[in-house]
Structure formats: structure tokens, C-alpha cells
């Protein structure tokens, strides 16, 4: 077990992201109120851009994703670095009916993406993930995303006035603004949409998810 896996396994085992709520062990951003918009956004993007397959880089406990899995018009692969999470997801989705493939894999997502052929993934979803990872790791992920995927959905925090690094402590976190260096240098030219991804009950104007197109899968 590497250092990243140890940290995030501890977070899940100790329920450190639950913050006193009872809905999702993946944290407040995975709760029902915080995911109403992303559920509709994801289904819409899959339909509009004719997505045939997608990878969820850090699927977590599927609290909100499980709601829309039956309606996905594409194959779905959920990755997570925490083995117990993947084991639970495999068991918990056995009875979901969908004509498309639904699979899960225990792996660090950067390592997995490096094993894939170029342009082999229509859509990468990386929601509420990079905020918890060192800048160097995030940049390497972005480079791989540009190589393997046609589209990327990635969380951004518009209120952040500068990007800083994060140490791998017990609960690593800092907001990331994708439209500022060093990330803007890699991604700005490819951005095609920026969509609200905050709670439904009250608007959090800084919480968005950006859509990037690196290659077109449309004929």
C-alpha cells in the first residue's frame, strides 16, 4: 500500500470526510443537495457529445452516482484507490439494470490512465479529487487526460485567487482554480463549457466543473 492509498484508506476507515452528516463517506460534496446539478449535467453531456465510454477517476462510495447509473447511455468504469470502497461498489451495483457495462477497479487513477492507449476514453470525470492531491500529481494527470481522453470534466473553484500546493497530511485539501497557472497553461485552450456544480438549496458561486475537449469523437 503506497502513501496515497494509506491516507485515503484512513480517511474512509475513520469517516473523516463525513463531517457529521449521514449520507456519504465521500464528503459533503457527494451529498444529495450538492449533486443535483452534476447528475443532470453528466447525463446531458453524455447524450449531447455521444459519449460511448467514461471513466470516473475517483468514484468513492457512489452515493449520488448510483442514482443515475441505470440511465447512463455509455459504459462506466469507476476507479478508486480504497479497496474496501471498490469491493462495496461491486456488491452494491449487482442488481442495477443497464444495457451498458458497469465496472469498478481498485487502482490509483494516474497509474491506470498511463496504461491506456491514446484517445481510448470518450469522457473522464474527475470531480472533487485534484484538490486533495499534490500539484505535481495533478499536472501529470492533466497530461495523461489530454492523451487518453476526448473530453474531461474537472472541478474548479473560481474564488481561488492563486493556486498553491498541498501536503499529504491526514486530510489534504486546497481549492484549485483551473483558469489560473499552472493549470491554465495546460487546459485553457481546450475549455468548451463551465457548469455550476454546487448545492441546490443555496448557490455557491465559486463551485463549477469545467468541460474540456481534447479530441472530437463526433463524425
Task: Mark where each language-model region is.
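A conserved beta-strand element that flanks and buttresses the S-adenosyl-L-methionine
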Residues: 125
